[in-house]
């Protein structure tokens, strides 16, 4: 573990890693500070970076598996202790590192008896195993195990559907996110006129926290570059013939009437610090803002694929704690 004393720059804005450690092959931790910042800037940067870290960084995962002799997902294969479903769940957890673009094929060819681990996966040159000891299956008899794998580099969360089943292969719910969690905190100093941003990052080992921070920052910059190159003369001009003047009273009334709705629309769900699973399931269901969330009932949420009652309870707890809001059991 590497830990440094926190010193605050009083001149140039700069990032600094103040703590770094490797808890295991699949768990890296890093803590960073950014200073000095003007009051309010730390929260703006922290929220944007957390969203980019959790949602915008690409990762590599196994997304499809094909067995030579499996009748269905919940069947068993003679000579293998695990069921097909258990093998799929073990393959889902395999952490990969790559500079892959799109998809590629891999395979497992193993003769029992013995333990099949991630080390036994035959990979293309541009894909690596992060933890070669990850367990896949235990062959108890001298049988041949042949498995075809589809590997994909993507971002976010891939949820299998019935439409994904093809050619006797089995799709896997894939979590592409290399960043397992990210938190930020803000500390004031200098008569509370300046701020320090603390950012904590946990990764699965396919990227270091420093690499993840670099990629998230680069992705944010890429999003804003088009605005920097936008030429004023190319902007659409307002059509003065179709404008309607509003009195100050009318403007005030409309703003007051929609104030609450506007505030809910401007608060995105990534700012609520939901766990990655809840965040991605909500996003897949086209729930992006707090207003979108409040337009659903508890019954609506429980119908979301892969959602459990515990997930709904966690959402209700966060809404109650931070906003004194609740969701109805149903909208009828």
Swiss-Prot record:
Residues 262-332 are annotated as: Alpha C-terminal domain (alpha-CTD). Its EC number is 2.7.7.6. Residues 1-231 are annotated as: Alpha N-terminal domain (alpha-NTD). SUPFAM superfamilies: C-terminal domain of RNA polymerase alpha subunit, Insert subdomain of RNA polymerase alpha subunit, RBP11-like subunits of RNA polymerase. It comes from the Eukaryota. Transmembrane segments: none annotated. DNA-dependent RNA polymerase catalyzes the transcription of DNA into RNA using the four ribonucleoside triphosphates as substrates. In plastids the minimal PEP RNA polymerase catalytic core is composed of four subunits: alpha, beta, beta', and beta''. When a (nuclear-encoded) sigma factor is associated with the core the holoenzyme is formed, which can initiate transcription. The N-terminal domain is essential for RNAP assembly and basal transcription, whereas the C-terminal domain is involved in interaction with transcriptional regulators and with upstream promoter elements. NCBIfam families: rpoA. This is DNA-directed RNA polymerase subunit alpha. The gene is rpoA.
